[in-house]
């Protein structure tokens, strides 16, 4: 039976293979940080990638929606939202709120984690208070792990985790290694009745922001986890069964490397598409062109008059005219 350790871990976890992979992960993460700075407006990335991450992270939990449904939910609130797209939108809202709170407080506390969870799940509860939670093999329904059952245990472990997250003096291991430890510890504590996976994946990215490895929450591991879902759960459990921290840490470091590279390619693609649209609007609709309008179109895959009014500080008739001319220009 796995006994959750008090952090920091006592065993050596920065092995030679881990240190070697750390070099690649940090290199790619630094390149991503630089690529983000080259964007004309970072909020374009935050909006685009947070929705993509929300979609992918929810898919890990078998909550499936399409981009079209998600963008409609973002645009029209409850009018066109499916139950799945509402859940995914709540995840994106939780991510943005968490980012704002971490930047404001320069801390990632349990109160912030609980607030993230409440937005994800759209309820007002906190850490589990009733026993009975178990983790099962999806295929066989066999119980593979039983997390702490009492509220006191959960609170004790989460207090230790909170300190480990925020007090750098507790451990001198690399922040990316710490992120892997934090993620495993959170999953093992399983502090909430539901939504632990999604909340934990938000904690991952916010921890990178907290440590200055990224300025904005733009690195998301959910697609990597989906692609390697079986291995993810196997390695998660292998730490509990066999104490194999090295394989778990290497898995997440490789995910950081791959995901950073994929996100850099995506950023270059967005910039190229923005340049193409900028050229087209300036040549064909020069009377309405502005960088702010271009940013709005890329910040909101589906835009509307209210967004134009608010972000460009123009009247409704002007915003309506902009969208009408853009629609005519697209059709011609």
Model-derived regions: residue spans:
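FIC/Doc superfamily catalytic core
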Residues: 1-332
């Amino acid at each position: 039976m796995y006994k959750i350790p008090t952090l920091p871990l006592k065993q050596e976890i920065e092995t030679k293979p881990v240190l070697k992979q750390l070099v690649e992960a940090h290199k790619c993460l630094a390149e991503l940080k630089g690529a983000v700075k080259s964007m004309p407006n970072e909020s374009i990335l935050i909006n685009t990638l947070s929705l993509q991450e929300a979609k992918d992270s929810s898919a890990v939990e078998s909550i499936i929606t399409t981009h079209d449904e998600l963008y409609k939910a973002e645009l029209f609130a409850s009018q066109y939202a499916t139950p799945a797209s509402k859940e995914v939108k709540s995840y994106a809202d939780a991510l943005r709120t968490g980012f704002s709170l971490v930047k404001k407080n320069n801390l990632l506390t349990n109160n912030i984690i609980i607030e993230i969870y409440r937005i994800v799940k759209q309820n007002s509860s906190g850490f589990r208070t009733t026993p009975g939670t178990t983790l099962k093999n999806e295929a066989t329904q066999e119980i593979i792990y039983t997390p702490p059952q009492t509220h006191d245990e959960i609170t004790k472990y989460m207090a230790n985790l909170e300190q480990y997250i925020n007090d750098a003096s507790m451990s001198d291991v690399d922040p990316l290694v710490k992120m892997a430890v934090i993620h495993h510890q959170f999953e093992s504590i399983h502090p909430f009745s539901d939504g632990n996976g999604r909340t934990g994946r938000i904690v991952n990215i916010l921890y990178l922001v907290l440590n200055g490895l990224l300025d904005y929450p733009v690195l998301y591991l959910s697609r990597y986890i989906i692609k390697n879902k079986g291995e993810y759960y196997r390695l998660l459990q292998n730490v509990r069964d066999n104490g194999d921290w090295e394989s778990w840490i290497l898995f997440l470091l490789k995910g950081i490397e791959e995901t950073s590279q994929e996100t850099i390619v995506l950023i270059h693609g967005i910039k190229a598409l923005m340049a193409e649209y900028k050229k087209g609007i300036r040549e064909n609709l020069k009377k309405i062109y502005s960088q702010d309008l271009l940013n709005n179109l890329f910040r909101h895959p589906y835009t509307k008059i209210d967004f134009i009014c608010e972000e460009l500080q123009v009247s409704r008739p002007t915003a309506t005219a902009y969208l009408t001319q853009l629609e005519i220009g697209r059709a011609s």
